[in-house]
Every structure is written in C-alpha cells, then in structure tokens.
Design a protein with these regions (language model features):
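Expand to "…catalyze enediolate/carbanion chemistry for C-C bond making/breaking, isomerization
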Residues: 1-268
Length: 269
C-alpha cells in the first residue's frame, strides 16, 4: 500500500465545524498546515447527515491549496462512524481522525472499514491516512500499542477536555493536569516513529499563556498543536519553525556526516 505524505509538516491543525459551510469554504487563507473538519462534538446530533453532505461537497469542490484535509469522525460507540468513513473516503479526505481511541483494535476496526470504502469508491488502497485521538486514561496508557497499530497511522493527538474529565479533575489553566499524558504520549510516539499533537487551548483572551504553552510542548518534543482559532496559527508556526541558527547547525551536521561517509568509502576502495 502507498501512504502519501505520512511525514508531512503538521504544526497546526485547525478545527472547523462541518455543520457550518461558511467556515469550511476558505480556511486555507489562514495558511494552517492541516484543517480538522469536524463531524463529532461540534455537530448537533440531528445535524449529522447535513454535516456529512457539506463535508462531501467541500472535499469534492473546494481547492484547499495544499492544506491537509483531516476529518474527525464520530466515536465507535455511536451509530454515525461507519457512514462518516464512507463519506470521507468517497470525498477524498487525506486523513481520518479517530475519536476516543483506546486500543489498537479501535484503529484496526476503522482501518477495515476505510479499506472497504476505498475499494467501494475506487480510491487507491492505503491512500486514506489515520490519526488517533486519545481522550481517556485507558487510551493514554495504551498509547504505544495504538501508535504501532497500523501503517496508515500518522500519529496520536491528546484531547485534553475529555481526558481531564476521565482523570476526575479539572482544567487548571496551568497544564499540570495534562503533563503525565503529554509525556507518556510523546514517548510512545517517538518509540513508534509517528507524530504527536497537543490538545487545544480555548482561552483566546490569554494569547500570552497560549504562546508559553506552545513553547513548552515544542520543548517536550511535540510535532504541533490542535487549534480552535486562526489567530493561533502564526504563533504556532513561529515557534515550531527552525531559527536560522538551527538551520545552519543542521546543515553543518549533515555536511559532516556526508564527509565522513565519503571518507569511509575511500578507505574501503
């Protein structure tokens, strides 16, 4: 199977409500790396069909100009997820985000239905990538097995709100309640060779706190962050983009490795 763009840059993933066509028609103007077209929590129960209709036509008709199109489907404990998958694949979504992932079997179950949909709609097998949202203590504890569950899986994302509820605590604003999950998830992702994204930050009146949080998760090793507002994109991109000093250092390391390799070849000859 081919897995296009599995390692592409994903610093920013901006959530968009599929129930509101006006929000999903031109988010590329804000230049996020990925958009998260949401069929789950943002969509009212009696609007799921309408949201899927909007999603399909957006995927088919709108040129998102290279922005990755991720779709968050409803959880496996709902009656919606199977049809969500069919619409995602039929429309040509790049990636499907699996909500409330707790085990490798959750990923396997979704993958089976994605493969069936690819065959049904004539999409190349393996062309639809997967990512897993960990939203519970069980999911976080199983992070490594989830990360290793599928060749399609690009990475895991923390869903802080639901995780905090499952932890039986509250969101403090300091992030202390999320640190254990963050550390376990990034270690699991790196061990498995996949990417890892931090949870959303919803207080748009505290952009200074948001900036400090983004700096912290970058230092922890995260690849990026889920976002709720276009104002947050530039902050994330600035922090996650290498400085000129870092680029020069990396180029120097690559050059030295290349020179060592050439010297080794000459010695063998």
């Amino acid at each position: 199977m081919s897995h296009p763009n599995k390692k592409r840059l994903r610093r920013s993933m901006m959530f968009l409500n599929c129930q509101k066509p006006g929000l999903i028609k031109d988010p590329y103007i804000y230049r996020p790396d990925s958009i998260m077209l949401d069929l789950e929590d943002a969509v009212a129960e009696n609007q799921k069909d309408a949201a899927r209709y909007s999603l399909y036509h957006a995927l088919q008709e709108i040129d998102y100009r290279g922005v990755e199109r991720v779709v968050r489907i409803n959880g496996l404990d709902t009656p919606h997820w199977k049809e969500d998958i069919r619409v995602c694949v039929a429309g040509g979504a790049d990636t499907i985000r699996i909500a409330k992932t707790e085990t490798a079997q959750d990923v396997h179950t979704v993958e089976e239905h994605v493969l069936a949909a690819e065959r049904e709609f004539g999409r190349p097998e393996g062309s639809t990538l997967l990512m897993a949202a960990l939203e519970s203590c069980k999911g976080v504890l199983n992070a490594l097995e989830v990360c290793k569950s599928s060749d399609r899986l690009i990475g895991i994302a923390l869903s802080g709100g639901d995780y905090t509820k499952d932890l039986q605590t509250v969101i403090t604003g300091t992030g202390v309640e999320l640190q254990g999950a963050r550390q376990q998830m990034i270690i699991a992702a790196r061990a498995a060779g996949v990417q890892c994204w931090d949870t959303v930050f919803t207080n748009l009146d505290a952009m200074d706190v948001f900036e400090e949080e983004v700096k912290m998760i970058k230092m922890m090793g995260f690849d990026g962050k889920s976002l709720v507002n276009p104002r947050q994109i530039d902050v994330v991109h600035k922090i996650f983009t290498p400085t000129q000093k870092e680029i020069i250092f990396a180029e120097k390391v690559v050059k030295e490795i290349d020179e060592i390799g050439r010297a080794s070849c000459r010695e063998r000859v």
